[in-house]
């Protein structure tokens, strides 16, 4: 299972939440800092593929938050 698969599984379970990449990393990998950048990269990839919707400006005051794209169905 890849990091992207882990993220999608989490987001399918937490459909109503908007989570930052940091939140996702802490939930999935118990705050292990080594995963933070890989999770952020995977979130960007999933957003570019249309699997995750993103909001926010990406700065410290308004970080990107991710949620399931409305068109994505659970499998």
What are the residue ranges of the model-derived segments?
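Short alpha-helical segments that sit at the start of domains
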Residues: 1-13, 17, 33, 71-75
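Short amphipathic alpha-helical segments
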Residues: 5, 21-22, 40-43
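Alpha-helical recognition domains of nuclear gene-regulatory proteins
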Residues: 10, 27, 42-45
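Short acidic, hydrophobic short linear motifs in intrinsically disordered regions
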Residues: 17-28
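Residue-level detector of family-conserved "landmark" positions at structurally sensitive sites
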Residues: 21, 35, 56-57
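Short amphipathic alpha-helical interaction segments
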Residues: 33-48
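A short, conserved structural fragment
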Residues: 47-57
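Short, cationic-aromatic polyanion-contact patches
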Residues: 57-75
